[in-house]
């Protein structure tokens, strides 16, 4: 429940996220999914995951449990991990959380879920997290590989213009048969887009902001030439 997560963790200052490129021109709206806990439980039951006495599901002697890592220096990521764990418990899945520094997390991320932060004004973000690495058999930040997805992105990079590449980037996300959305391989789960909050001096009129990239840079002053003081 992304909206509940935004309420609990961000005090409402965020929007639901479904991909690394929400609302960008190359965004595929097929990435969006409706929250439905009842259907999620039904799918688990149908797949043979039955609740044990402690409420955690099991199948063939295997408990539905795993660990999610987060950067201990980032309180927001820790809170997101904890909220995710609480919501999973309602489904009968036990999620343990673990603070891990980047020196450890980068290596473990290929076999263990990690709370990341991404987002930039370029479709290369899709390439960075989903394309198979040059010297490996998986993507750089997750154990993911899909030749069809790779092909779409390779073709997109060869397009004559950025605009000509949009459809190929969208197909890399979902082409009706395969991709990285919830109907495809879904190697990443996207939680939320965090609103950047600032103190503003009385009388200063800040121009309408475009979507801010993840956490870095000077996006707030991207259009400072359009700011003005109230008369």
Regions found by a protein language model. Give the residues of each.
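Structural motif corresponding to the C-terminal cap of alpha-helices
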Residues: 48-51, 160
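Detector for C-terminal structural segments
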Residues: 1-32, 36-39, 76-85, 105-231
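Ligand/substrate-recognition segments at binding pockets and active sites
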Residues: 50-121, 196
């Amino acid at each position: 429940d992304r909206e509940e997560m935004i309420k609990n963790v961000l005090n409402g200052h965020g929007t639901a996220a479904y991909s690394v490129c929400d609302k960008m021109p190359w965004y595929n709206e097929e990435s969006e999914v409706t929250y439905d806990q009842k259907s999620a439980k039904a799918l688990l039951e149908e797949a043979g995951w039955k609740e044990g006495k402690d409420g955690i599901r099991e199948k063939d002697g295997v408990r539905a449990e795993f660990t999610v890592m987060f950067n201990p220096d980032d309180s927001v990521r820790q809170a997101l991990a904890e909220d995710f764990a609480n919501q999973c418990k309602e489904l009968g899945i036990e999620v343990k959380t673990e603070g891990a520094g980047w020196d450890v997390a980068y290596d473990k991320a290929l076999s263990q879920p990690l709370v990341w932060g991404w987002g930039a004004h370029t479709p290369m973000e899709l390439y960075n997290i989903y394309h198979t690495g040059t010297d490996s058999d998986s993507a750089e930040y997750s154990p993911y590989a899909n030749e069809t997805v790779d092909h779409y992105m390779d073709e997109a990079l060869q397009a004559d213009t950025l605009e000509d590449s949009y459809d190929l980037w969208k197909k890399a996300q979902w082409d009706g048969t395969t991709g990285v959305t919830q109907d495809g391989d879904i190697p990443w789960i996207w939680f939320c887009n965090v609103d950047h909050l600032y103190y503003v001096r009385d009388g200063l009129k800040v121009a309408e902001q475009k979507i801010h990239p993840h956490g870095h840079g000077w996006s707030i002053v991207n259009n400072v030439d359009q700011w003005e003081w109230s008369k």
